[in-house]
Amino acid sequence: KFIFIFIIGFNSLHAFQPSIEDTKNFLKPELNLVWQEEFSDPKLNTDKWAFQLGNGAEYGIAGWGNNELQFYTDSSDNFELSDGMLKIIPLYNKDSSKTFTSVKLVTKDLVNFTSPGVLEVKFKIPKGQGLWPAIWMMPEKNRFGGWPKSGEIDLMEARGSNTNEVLSTLHFFQNGHRLLGSEYKVSNENNFNQNFHIITLIWGIDKISFYIDNQFLVYEGSLTKLLGAKYPFNESFYLILNTAIGGDFVKAPKPNEICSLDNCDDSKKFIVDYIRYYQ
């Protein structure tokens, strides 16, 4: 395993490693499971999830602000609930006006998460150049201003062209854009496409930690000193599951590596087994 911690926009930052007490405080056995999604029903639970549709132009951010190519739909061509799992299906259809389609599910206005708590998600990523699966969170309210002032929590994002690596990142700051995160790399045999892994967000008051399969990734316990009263991560956030196609984060998509209507095995789908939140 290999972990690389990255910081963009800082002259200095302290306290990467959580203390033993910090970790114990969140992993106590008396934590209660307060929300879960096991995807065991054959239909999507619309009390928990909504579809965000379009290509971003509807929100004034065509390409979703990252030059992404997909159009998000609520079509059964782009997702399925089977084997007790959610499977997001990024799709290439050369005969459609919407060449690339996918699904983006959000809990916005339905379920919000607040600290302190522990959020864990069991997942597999799709394999294919240009695919960009993500598990992330955005603020319920932009209390401190528009992005990134009110924060963004990326539990997991990955590139379908490199199934040995995932990233966890925090986005924030009042003047410009700063981020703190880490890359986590595994062996070919343990890659994120063929094997399930669990990402855990340990979300405290004034501090955040990420773990993959109980392996420490990155700890943030010093941003309150930098941001003061405008520290955004003590607010309520909602959850997002999606797979983008193309964009600034990934290479240009190869259509032959992406699902088509008549050819799509599970290796090309973003699969989520469960989501659980403890407090």
Task: Name the predicted role of every residue range.
Residues 16-279:
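GH16 jelly-roll
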